[in-house]
Each structure stands twice: as C-alpha cells, then as structure tokens.
Amino acid sequence: MSASQDSRSRDNGPDGMEPEGVIESNWNEIVDSLDDMNLSESLLRGIYAYGFEKPSAIQQRAILSCIKGYDVIAQAQSGTGKTATFAISILQQIELDLKATQALVLAPTRELAQQIQKVVMALGDYMGASCHACIGGTNVRAEVQKLQMEAPHIIVGTPGRVFDMLNRRYLSPKYIKMFVLDEADEMLSRGFKDQIYDIFQKLNSNTQVVLLSATMPSDVLEVTKKFMRDPIRILVKKEELTLEGIRQFYINVEREEWKLDTLCDLYETLTITQAVIFINTRRKVDWLTEKMHARDFTVSAMHGDMDQKERDVIMREFRSGSSRVLITTDLLARGIDVQQVSLVINYDLPTNRENYIHRIGRGGRFGRKGVAINMVTEEDKRTLRDIETFYNTSIEEMPLNVADLI
C-alpha cells in the first residue's frame, strides 16, 4: 500500500514480471489436501458438500497464503477455482460473532458478483456467515435498509454501487480486513481504475489485498504497486490450464453473411445440452436472436442494455436448463458458471484475445470436457492464428463427426 517501490528500474517492465504479461511466482508452498489447510470444521463440511474433493492448482497454492494474511496476486485462467480460493480464505478468517462487514469483494459485472455470492453462501452454508451482493441495477432504498438492519459479514459487489454505499456511510469500512479484486485485469482497465482507487482510500491502511486475474497486462501490475505490500505472486501457467479438456475447432465461412446459415446447420446437427453463443455487439445479439426465432430455433439473449431484472430471469432460466442456448456479448464471458455448458460458439472472434479464454473457459470447467467452435471469415484468419500463438494451442478445422464430441 506504500508507493515507495516506484523508483525501481523499468528496463524489464514492472518488477515481478516476465515478458508477455505473465507474473513470476515467488511462492512455492503447495498444500494438496483440504484436510491439511487447518480449516474450521463447519467450513470443511460446506466445501465437501459443494462437491470439492481435491484443491485445484490455484487453491493448493493460494488459500494458505491468503489465510496467513499476505497480500496476494494470483494469476490463473477461468474455470480453475479462483472464486473458491478467495471464498474459502475469507470464510476461514471471518469472526462470526462480530456483526460487521469484514471482507469486501469487487467484481467487474453484476452477474459475476452474484455468482461469487452464491459460491460464498454455499461454501459457508454450515457456518452461518452472511454475504450480500451490492450491485447496480437494483433498488437503492431496499439495499440501504438491508445494510442498516444488520451489516453482512461479507459484501460482494460492483465498484459503482459499493463506492456509493461507502460514500454515504451505509457500508462501514471499520472492520474490513480483506479486500479482494476478482478479474482484476477487467476491473483495472480504464473503466474501474478510478472507482477502485476511491474505494481503496476509504479502507484501513492495514487491509489485506488479494488480486486475482487470468491475464496480467503490465498496467495491472503497475497499479498493484500502489496498494499492495510485498505481495506473494502465484502463477498457474497457461499451459497447465483450462484449454486442456476443451476441444477447439474453427469453421471456414468465407463471408460474414454466411454465418447465420452455418449456425442453423450446426444447430440441426448437434444435440446440445447447453450452449453459449458469443457475439461482439449488443445490436448484433438482438439481430441474431430475431433471425433464429424467425427460423423457429429456441434461443435466449442477454446483454448490457437489458435491465437487471430481465437479465436475472434469463440467467435463472439458463442455469435451470429451461433455456438451452444463450446468445450474449463479452459482458457474460466473465462470470457465467453454468455446469452443463458443453459447447461455446464464437459467432464472432473476440476483438480482444484475452477474452478468448474467458469465453471458452465456460465449457469443460473443473475438468469437464467441452467443445469450442469458432466461425472464421477470411478477415478473421489472422486473429485466429494470433489466438493460437498467444495461448500456445492449436485450433483445428471442425471434423464432420463433431456431434460425437459433444
């Protein structure tokens, strides 16, 4: 939290960085069994009830360092158990008898904040810990009443609403001892940097800071220097991660206007449990949804122009399985944790290659198998090669028997 390290040489990029925006680990302690983490019995019960048996790579490295109170920067891709890593660390450190907010988690989207809240509540099921989602798009008055009635032990929220509640003193920073930034690359990108900084100014100077992210652009690390003290750096390497178990293919569609027919053909060929189709713009989401409906295909759509209630209903239907295909933008690429998603279709390749992992990391989470299909026009070929190089992966042309793989 001191900025005294700014005098370091910048020749090799930020301190603690390897080239290519990857952090260099400085922590090698691994605990590969949940029983050896000295967790409370009621928390362990919740963890096992949630279905965890063995900690993932990031959990083996990061849970203990978080519980010990260190500032931690952890880099690992989607689907590797980052959420449970900090949820377990928070729940272990909460004093249940103290009816005050003791941990604050920030996430870039409302959906991700709600997803984190669900995980915290499930893992803390036998403890009686309270967790509240403090997000935009919901009724402010109702939120104020809730916070005034009894402060929740844990708050998970989006930066705008959290800052508003802190600023108006409905949320007290007095007992907050742990501050978590999830998907920090997204949060610290232009949109939220100032808000996070404002929130940080309101916290105690000895608050523990934990930052989790799939990608680590150098500007994120520069920002971490401003408010983290000698952080533990934990890297779970790209090649150890979630692209494993996900078969990736591309379909050549020479021209943009042929994508719709190709998608409809695919739809008829495959038996889809659940699929997500990613598109780059909100307007195009509406356009494709309309076209699919006109051809009698059942799909639902979601993007940032919709109000929160509508988005909640659509997510609920998709999670419960009553809606099977969801068309969406990158808004959802971070934070949709639907266990049954077996297929991701990139109708448009992401404009930002970092988002590729967030999109296809939806299928095959925690070792489940998944398939990702990329629709590629002539203009997209260079982007596809760029993605292959960046992730050190190979994306093959889609085979005719693709139905057998899903």
Curated annotation (Swiss-Prot):
Residues 63-234 form the Helicase ATP-binding domain. The modification Phosphothreonine is found at residue 158. Transmembrane segments: none annotated. ATP binds at residues 76-83. The keyword Ubl conjugation applies. Gene3D superfamilies: P-loop containing nucleotide triphosphate hydrolases. Pfam families: DEAD (PF00270), Helicase_C (PF00271). A motif (Q motif) lies at residues 32-60. The modification Phosphoserine is found at residue 4. GO terms for cellular component: cytoplasmic stress granule; nuclear stress granule; perinuclear region of cytoplasm; plasma membrane. GO terms for molecular function: ATP binding; ATP hydrolysis activity; RNA binding; RNA helicase activity; translation initiation factor activity. One of its GO terms (biological process) is positive regulation of transcription by RNA polymerase II. It catalyses: ATP + H2O = ADP + phosphate + H(+). Its EC number is 3.6.4.13. It is found in: Cytoplasm, Perinuclear region; Cell membrane; Cytoplasm, Stress granule. Residues 245-406 form the Helicase C-terminal domain. InterPro entries: DEAD/DEAH_box_helicase_dom, EIF4A_DEADc, Helicase_ATP-bd, Helicase_C-like, P-loop_NTPase, RNA-helicase_DEAD-box_CS, RNA_helicase_DEAD_Q_motif. There is a cross-link at residues 146, 225, 238, 309, 369, 381 (Glycyl lysine isopeptide (Lys-Gly) (interchain with G-Cter in SUMO2)). The modification N-acetylserine is found at residue 2. Keywords: Acetylation, ATP-binding, Cell membrane, Cytoplasm, Helicase, Hydrolase, Initiation factor, Isopeptide bond, Membrane, Nucleotide-binding, Phosphoprotein, Protein biosynthesis, RNA-binding, Ubl conjugation. PROSITE patterns: DEAD_ATP_HELICASE, HELICASE_ATP_BIND_1, HELICASE_CTER, Q_MOTIF. Belongs to the DEAD box helicase family. eIF4A subfamily. ATP-dependent RNA helicase which is a subunit of the eIF4F complex involved in cap recognition and is required for mRNA binding to ribosome. In the current model of translation initiation, eIF4A unwinds RNA secondary structures in the 5'-UTR of mRNAs which is necessary to allow efficient binding of the small ribosomal subunit, and subsequent scanning for the initiator codon. As a result, promotes cell proliferation and growth. This is Eukaryotic initiation factor 4A-I. It comes from Pongo abelii.
